[in-house]
Amino acid sequence: TNLRDVPMFYVHGGQDWPIYAKTGPLPITDEMRRLGYNGSLWMIAEAGHNTISVSTERVLDWALQQKRVAHPRRITHRAYFPPHGRAWWVEIQEIERPGWFAEVDARIEEGNRIVVACRNTTRVVLRPDPDLLNRRERIAVLLDGRVVFDDVCGGQQEIVLSRHAATWSGV
């Protein structure tokens, strides 16, 4: 998910409801570490639910060290509705099976190349980020292991990927 580029710092009081810690911040931060994301947990043994009096300085110091990733090379995005389908340079425009989320996992690789995997969608738009790709040169797009686009972007500066029957194509 896009949490890949969003650092998370959980603070939990050791005297707070222990069940919450076991179903909330503990498994969340474990999963973030498993995925290689930047997530950490600070358990304050003597604190209850309200940790602000003992955690503010450390939390602010941590927050001031974080940097926003303005141009992510990889985006994994899910949406239940097309109006919620845009994330950075990827947009889900059509959902094949309503009621189920559509998903796009797209990453920019060396050589002006984008590798994409899609689920439950029939139309995806890529808007190549000029900080990551040279839009004046050919851009290759591989979708589910097959080249579906290998050209320069048109005047719209976007690549539209559409699936008809079982075949994806790009323009």
Which residues fall in each region the model found?
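Short beta-strand/loop motif that positions the catalytic acidic residue
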Residues: 3, 9-13
